């Protein structure tokens, strides 16, 4: 989903509409397609989804969690079981990139966040899909209202 949205240019010009650093570092969140429209108030952001141009419907992505020792991910189900959490393949570490969503586990669409510190309280509840491997100082400098000029895929 994220790769497809980058290729479509969905993130180009979107705003980081939620930056939480106080009282302790938490996340920088962006990717709301509504934020491309500069007249949209920041208070209205956080609920936007990617609207698929072919279907004119919101593209919603189920929660996806991958556990060590299992061949396939589990979809659509939150886990808070400590014995399962220890087997998650991707957890919330500083620099983890994850899908933002509403309370419904299958409501992720385009919005994402970057963890500013380890966030074990989110493990098993939100899908981590990437990691900042360089440039964490850029993430640390993001301010609410900053915009993504252009998102590009980097091939190894």
PLM regions and their residue ranges:
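Cross-family detector of peptidyl-prolyl cis-trans isomerase
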Residues: 1-156
